[in-house]
């Protein structure tokens, strides 16, 4: 076996260096707590008015949240509901204190247009505070959008209706965002019934109305608007759209941020008249860095500015493409990074099928296109209408900038690839006792809410921590006529930090949750502090409490060591109490199940499960959240795997090499084993039974070279040797045998041996028949050389031969008589040629001619030293015409112990007076015992070349 390749160290080095060049993809964190809403009060849910038959059938049809002055406004189908958050804090259920009803008056015409009845209601899609006293609301109004003004406190209509075109979409499924800034309404939506004209529009103010370019894919291409923000001198719009710069990849969506100047007055009559002159857009890059960047391109939700590491940032939820591997990510973008991105280079497409490349600075006109007139680079121009035409034409053809806005931490704050897709985000940037902790609340499309600590904050590590996972969906209250998948999707999140609540909106209902569930820790201080919940703290007398609640300022945030070691951990739900020294593990559930003890030094629980009602149940694990979220470095893991593989391959290769060498050594020594019998000469058989002379001394080197082959075998030759030729003997199918007539045998003994493959036993007697009348293989024992007395004896088996060699044996009785009697009555053959050929009857199809065993005679030739090698080349056997053996003619050829066909002698049968040993072909060609044999001495038709042997006295031994 070849030795292990020398390239193994190189392969090991390659495997060790490969992980260094790759960045491991972040793993999904494991939630520390899993909860559901079992036992939650029914008053925490709101589905619509009790007397509303449509709401009872379809549900709420939630559209939008808006919080104003401790009042929560909920826009829905045909209604706007107002909830007093102060009353909710006092224990009242989720019941609106007032609401407005605005139904469509054009439902009949909507049905004529081919729309379904469920689509023809008035869905309130826009809800914007116009000032401190007025609320602007716009509805689809059966595909005829209309806007109205309402008083915030009274919810009574004020003024006349306005057209909602370009302010509100026609269809409830189309996206829209709107914001009021400096007395004007900035909206982004579809401006026509077919949603083919996407528009960013300004109206209802002292400034002239402006819009984006119509039907220009460079400006907007099938956008889905998500959020609008006023910041500084600009209004920002966040959306996703079908990419124009990567159109060769198909319909790939990119996340964008676009901005316009609030003081923009439009262009001149020659260019961009009544259109934006400051419209620019950038790509938002939310991706996992590495050799091949993995992008989360589809923006789903965005928050307002939140403090992150001392800087104002926006938090967004991004997902992968719809036809890609499902995955979600949370990325934060600093506002100053977004502003800096709008100072980047412009991008253009020089040819129709060409790539988008940055525009060189020498081709950009001055002042910089997109600048606000009167400030900055365009300070010399008091109005955008005074800008040069080349600037206006350039900004019309180059609204896209390069490069993309990077995330705040250069990578996502959280990535999820094995869970449901995230759809909504809400951020509390002032959590914790010192109001400096950021907590993310994330909604998904399967109805779960995640409470997450982002990395770098209180998580004390580079990995995020999922503090809690809550299943907030209730099929009984929120299903309606929608599909189960659509009904479970969370489409809105609203934080009430003062009331310590989170409002979760589904298409059919809304529900509110507490931001924390500190009471579940009971009287276990270790569990309370190890939960890492920024809303929970330990009170000396009240246990684990909410730090925002009554007495929340008098809490112990670090814990007393003596209290943690000797205090009791009590389950608040069941009242069971653990002994001293028990860990923070509390079995939250009914029943007297014992608690799981652990080391007192470990104060960090792991994943647990609980419910929000009286029936709580869960398990916590004995790991800190920080250490639990950290995994083994991927490079180290791959290096260990590669080293283990290389070590195992080396050891296994060494073992296999040793085993092969040992097998070759055994094969060369030809060890006799019961499972692998080999052909034996008669001399060997005689010696095994105590007969025959002692073996001659080992020959000299010169004589050993002349030693011929003693026998052949079916054993495979060693490497480098020629395979046995008996394995490929011709068959009757491949070598047809024709009847031979009037052939005459050669007079020489060696030619008689060459033609002996067609010899028969004699005239008038079927070949292959024994004395008993059945076919049996024959054994012909060659007489001893001249000068040695011998005796012709015929036996039926090798056993009889061995018994004869030991001495005189009594005659057989029964079914095994000696075969000497039939031979005495056999008439002698008149010609040698009559006994040299067999009939032309073919052999059986599945029969391979057996081997021939020749007994070497004693002579002056050197005896082989030891046993002959199994791989000695075998004599070539055939069924064709005669050939001379490659032996000298001046001496008799060496005897060979070879297997021959049972039907008669082979072409290498000896001449007259030469006795051969024929053995039947063993089953399977190897490894089987020899069959019954018959020892015969054929009558010599011609005098032999040497002196004929004389009969030996009975009982004497053969000399071989």
From Swiss-Prot:
It is found in: Cell membrane. GO terms for molecular function: chemorepellent activity; semaphorin receptor binding. Residues 555-624, 685-725, 745-792, 806-960 are annotated as: Disordered. InterPro entries: Semap_dom, Semap_dom_sf, Semaphorin, WD40/YVTN_repeat-like_dom_sf. Gene3D superfamilies: ligand-binding face of the semaphorins, domain 2, YVTN repeat-like/Quinoprotein amine dehydrogenase. Residues 899-909 have a biased composition (Low complexity). Residues 1-23 form the signal peptide. GO terms for cellular component: cytoplasm; plasma membrane. One of its GO terms (biological process) is neural crest cell migration. Residues 657-960 are cytoplasmic. Residues 922-935 have a biased composition (Basic and acidic residues). The keyword RNA-binding does not apply. Residues 24-635 are extracellular. Glycans are attached at residues 69, 285, 436. Expressed in many regions of the developing nervous system, probably in neurons and their precursors, but also in nonneural tissue such as immature muscle and dermis. In adult, strong expression in the skeletal muscle and moderate expression in the brain, where cerebellum shows the highest expression. Also expressed in almost all areas of the CNS. It is a single-pass type I membrane protein. Pfam families: Sema (PF01403). Residues 29-515 form the Sema domain. Disulfide bonds join 110-120, 138-147, 261-372, 286-331, 478-509, 518-536, 524-569, 528-544. The chain crosses the membrane at residues 636-656. Keywords: Cell membrane, Developmental protein, Differentiation, Disulfide bond, Glycoprotein, Membrane, Neurogenesis, Signal, Transmembrane, Transmembrane helix. Residues 940-952 have a biased composition (Pro residues). Belongs to the semaphorin family. PANTHER family: SEMAPHORIN, SEMAPHORIN-6C. Shows growth cone collapsing activity on dorsal root ganglion (DRG) neurons in vitro. May be a stop signal for the DRG neurons in their target areas, and possibly also for other neurons. May also be involved in the maintenance and remodeling of neuronal connections. This is Semaphorin-6C. It comes from Rattus norvegicus (Rat). The gene is Sema6c.
């Amino acid at each position: 076996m070849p030795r292990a390749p020398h390239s193994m160290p190189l392969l090991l080095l390659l495997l060790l260096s490969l992980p260094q060049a790759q960045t491991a993809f972040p793993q999904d964190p494991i939630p520390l707590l899993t909860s559901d809403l079992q036992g939650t009060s029914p008053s925490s849910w709101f589905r619509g008015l009790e007397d509303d038959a449509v709401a009872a059938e379809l549900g709420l049809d939630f559209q939008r949240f808006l919080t104003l002055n401790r009042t929560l406004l909920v826009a829905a189908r045909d209604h706007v509901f107002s909830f007093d958050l102060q009353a909710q804090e006092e224990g009242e259920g989720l019941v609106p204190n007032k609401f407005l009803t605005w139904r469509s008056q054009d439902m009949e015409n909507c049905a004529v247009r081919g729309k379904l009845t469920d689509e023809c209601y008035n869905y309130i899609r826009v809800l914007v505070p116009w000032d401190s006293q007025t609320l602007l609301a716009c509805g689809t109004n059966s595909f005829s959008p209309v806007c109205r003004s309402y008083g915030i406190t009274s919810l009574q209509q004020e003024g006349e209706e306005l057209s909602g075109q370009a302010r509100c979409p026609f269809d409830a499924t189309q996206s829209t965002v709107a914001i009021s800034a400096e007395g004007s309404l900035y909206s982004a939506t579809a401006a026509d019934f077919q949603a083919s004209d996407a528009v960013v529009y300004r109206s209802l103010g002292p400034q002239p109305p402006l819009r984006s370019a119509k039907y220009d894919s460079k400006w907007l291409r099938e956008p889905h608007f998500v959020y609008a923000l006023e910041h500084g001198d600009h209004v920002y719009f966040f959306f996703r759209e079908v990419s124009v710069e990567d159109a060769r990849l198909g319909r790939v969506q990119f996340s964008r941020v676009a901005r316009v100047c609030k003081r923009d007055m439009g262009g001149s009559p020659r260019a961009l008249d009544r259109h934006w002159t400051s419209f620019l857009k950038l790509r938002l890059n939310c991706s996992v860095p590495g050799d091949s960047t993995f992008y989360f391109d589809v923006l789903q939700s965005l928050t307002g500015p939140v403090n992150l590491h001392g800087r104002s940032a926006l938090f967004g939820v991004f997902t992968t493409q719809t036809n890609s591997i499902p995955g979600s990510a949370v990325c934060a973008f600093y506002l100053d990074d977004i502003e800096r991105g709008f100072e980047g280079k412009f991008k253009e497409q020089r040819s129709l099928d060409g790539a988008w490349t940055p525009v060189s600075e020498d081709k950009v006109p001055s002042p910089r296109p997109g600048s606000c007139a009167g400030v900055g680079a365009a300070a010399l121009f008091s109005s955008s209408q005074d800008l040069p035409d080349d600037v206006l034409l350039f900004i019309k053809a180059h609204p896209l900038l390069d490069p993309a806005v990077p995330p705040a931490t250069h990578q996502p704050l959280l990535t999820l690839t094995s869970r449901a897709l995230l759809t909504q985000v809400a951020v509390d940037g002032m959590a914790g006792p010192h109001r400096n902790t950021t907590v993310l609340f994330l909604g998904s499309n399967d109805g779960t809410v995640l409470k997450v600590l982002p990395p770098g904050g209180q998580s004390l590590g580079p990995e995020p921590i999922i503090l809690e996972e809550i299943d907030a969906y209730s099929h009984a209250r929120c299903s309606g006529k929608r599909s189960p998948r659509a009904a479970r999707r969370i489409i809105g999140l609203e934080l009430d930090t003062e009331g310590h609540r989170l409002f979760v909106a589904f298409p059919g209902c809304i529900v509110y949750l507490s931001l924390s569930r500190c009471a579940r820790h009971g009287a276990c201080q270790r569990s309370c502090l190890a939960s890492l919940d920024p809303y929970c703290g330990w009170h000396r007398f009240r246990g684990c409490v909410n730090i925002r609640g009554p007495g929340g300022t008098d809490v112990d945030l670090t814990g007393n060591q003596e209290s943690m070691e000797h205090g009791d951990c009590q389950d608040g739900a069941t009242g069971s109490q653990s002994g001293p020294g028990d860990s923070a593990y509390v079995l939250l559930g009914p029943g007297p199940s014992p608690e799981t003890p652990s080391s007192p030094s470990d104060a960090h629980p792991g994943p647990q499960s609980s419910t929000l009602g009286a029936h709580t149940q869960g398990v916590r694990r004995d790991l800190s959240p920080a250490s639990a979220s950290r995994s083994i470095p991927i490079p180290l893991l791959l290096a260990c795997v590669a080293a283990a593989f290389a070590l195992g391959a080396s050891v296994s290769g060494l073992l296999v090499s040793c085993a092969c060498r040992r097998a070759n050594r055994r094969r060369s020594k030809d060890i006799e084993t019961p499972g692998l019998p080999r052909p034996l000469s008669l001399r060997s058989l005689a010696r095994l039974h105590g007969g025959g002379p002692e073996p001659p001394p080992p020959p000299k080197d010169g004589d050993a070279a002349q030693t011929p082959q003693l026998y052949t075998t079916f054993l495979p030759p060693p490497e480098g040797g020629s395979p046995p030729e008996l394995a490929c003997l011709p068959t009757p199918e491949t070598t047809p045998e024709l009847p031979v007539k009037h052939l005459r045998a050669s007079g020489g003994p060696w030619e008689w041996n060459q033609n002996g493959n067609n010899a028969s036993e004699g005239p008038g007697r079927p070949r292959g028949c024994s004395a008993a009348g059945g076919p049996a293989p024959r054994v012909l024992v060659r007489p001893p050389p001249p000068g040695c007395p011998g005796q012709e004896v015929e036996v039926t088996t090798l056993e009889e031969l061995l018994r004869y060699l030991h001495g005189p044996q009594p005659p057989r009785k029964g079914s095994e008589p000696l075969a000497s009697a039939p031979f005495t009555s056999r008439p002698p053959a008149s010609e040698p040629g009559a006994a040299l050929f067999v009939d032309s009857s073919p052999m059986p199809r599945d029969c391979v001619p057996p081997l021939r065993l020749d007994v070497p005679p004693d002579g002056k030739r050197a005896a082989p030293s030891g046993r002959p090698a199994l791989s000695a080349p075998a004599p070539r056997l055939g069924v064709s015409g005669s050939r001379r053996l490659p032996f000298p003619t001046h001496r008799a050829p060496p005897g060979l112990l070879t297997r021959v066909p049972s039907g008669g002698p082979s072409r290498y049968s000896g001449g007259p007076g030469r006795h051969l040993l024929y053995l039947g072909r063993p089953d399977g060609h190897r490894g089987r015992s020899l069959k019954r044999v018959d020892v015969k001495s054929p009558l010599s038709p011609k005098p032999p070349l040497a002196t004929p042997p004389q009969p030996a006295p009975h009982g004497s031994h053969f000399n071989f």
